[in-house]
Amino acid sequence: MFSQIGAFLDSALLLLVAFFAVYRLVLVLCRWQRRQLDIPIHI
């Protein structure tokens, strides 16, 4: 039972880190695109 909880926590942490990384990447890409085009982008 404890091993299942540990595996679930590991996968949840991995998902959280992956989501945060993708979120940061999207923010950087939007900022770079806005700087390139010089047009305000509404999300």
Curated annotation (Swiss-Prot):
Subcellular location: Virion; Host cell membrane
Entry keywords, A to Z: Host cell membrane, Host membrane, Membrane, Transmembrane, Transmembrane helix, Virion
A GO cellular-component term linked to this record: virion component
Main location: virion
Top-level taxon: Viruses
Transmembrane segment boundaries: 2-22
Subunit structure: Interacts with proteins GP2B and GP4.
Family the entry assigns: Belongs to the arteriviridae ORF5a protein family.
Function summary: Minor virion component that plays an essential role in virus infectivity.
Protein name according to UniProt: Structural protein ORF5a
Organism: Porcine reproductive and respiratory syndrome virus (strain Lelystad)
Highest classification ranks of the organism: Viruses, Riboviria, Orthornavirae, Pisuviricota, Pisoniviricetes
